[in-house]
A protein has these predicted regions:
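Domain-level detector for secreted/extracellular nuclease and nuclease-toxin modules, and
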Residues: 8, 15-299
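Bacterial N-terminal signal peptides that target proteins for export
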Residues: 1-8
């Protein structure tokens, strides 16, 4: 009887293990498709403008790292076809750069507790132009007396783990003209919230960037760096029950609770035209992107 009971239990559990294995395999396949679509090829070094340097930034090498709660490149959005896109792979993040606007389309990175610790200091780094993109490109003088801050997309505070990562976070391809009230206020508070979530929840997959409305024409500086109308941020957590949330901030004054900026990822996709987290299995992607529940994030 015990043998029969053991066999029955094993038979019941087998579909569960098979299901988990199938999800991992599909994620591996979709990750490979996503990276290939935007020109990211594993173990390829930078070879000039437009190529992708694959510094791993300390992440696992495959989606099979799910067992440790971290997937490689799960944060990378789908390829953009309606705007210029040059993919730049940095130590701590990946950029989709728009040469017409001189700012990123998006910046994506994985945030973990390990990345929040280290001796690298913001004070040791300076903003500098990115020579991996063609001229005209943003330079420091474009921001002087412009009325806008040099607003990090992937924040310096998420790159304390590496001096190289910290320095690269100050490249102007990771920067947008940002209203001082936003950069030093609600946007900064959201960056701090993401660090808190990473410590409490585990690895986060984050994408953020500028939003330009139809008639956006404002620029700053000699190089005509485009000034965004708003900014977005989407956050995915795969620890336990997968969940995601989006945020949209106007590029101006603001002093409101985080929940006031919250949106579903689907809504952020509708506004930006960007397909986020395409490597997720469809059943997971559809579920987490349709949901906006600030209570899940304690906001």
């Amino acid at each position: 009887m015990n043998k029969i009971r053991t066999i029955l239990v094993a038979c019941c559990l087998l579909p569960v293990f098979c299901s988990c294995g199938e999800v991992a395999k599909r994620m591996d396949a979709k990750l490979a498709e996503s990276k290939a679509a935007i020109g990211i090829v594993e173990n390829t070094e930078t070879d000039g403008v437009g190529e992708s340097s694959l510094a791993s930034g300390g992440k696992k090498s495959s989606a099979t790292a799910a067992a440790d709660g971290e997937y490689t490149d799960l944060e990378i959005p789908a390829r953009l076809t309606s705007v210029p896109e040059q993919i730049l792979r940095r130590t701590g993040y990946t950029v989709s750069y728009n040469s017409n606007r001189r700012v990123p389309n998006w910046v994506a990175w994985c945030l973990t507790v390990e990345r929040l610790t280290g001796n690298s200091k913001r004070s040791d780094a300076k903003f500098h132009e990115d020579t991996d993109v063609p001229e005209p490109r943003a330079v420091d003088f474009d921001y002087v007396r412009s009325g806008y801050d040099r607003g990090h997309m992937c924040p310096a505070g998420d790159n304390k783990w590496s001096a190289l990562a910290m320095g690269e976070s100050f490249l102007f391809t990771n920067v947008c003209p940002q209203a001082p009230q936003l950069n030093r206020g609600d946007w900064n508070e959201m960056e701090q919230a993401c660090r808190k979530w990473a410590k409490q929840e585990g690895a986060l997959y984050i994408v953020c960037g500028p939003i330009f409305y139809k008639n956006s024409k404002k620029t700053i500086g000699k190089n005509r760096v485009s000034v965004p109308d708003a900014f977005f941020k989407v956050v995915l957590c795969m620890t336990g029950e997968p969940k995601a949330i989006g945020f949209i901030y106007k590029n101006g004054d603001g002093n409101r609770p985080k929940g006031d900026y919250a949106n579903s990822v689907d809504e952020v996709e509708r506004i930006t035209g960007i397909d986020f987290f395409p490597a997720l299995p469809d059943e997971i992607e559809d579920k987490v992107e349709a949901t906006c529940n600030p209570d899940d994030w304690n906001i």
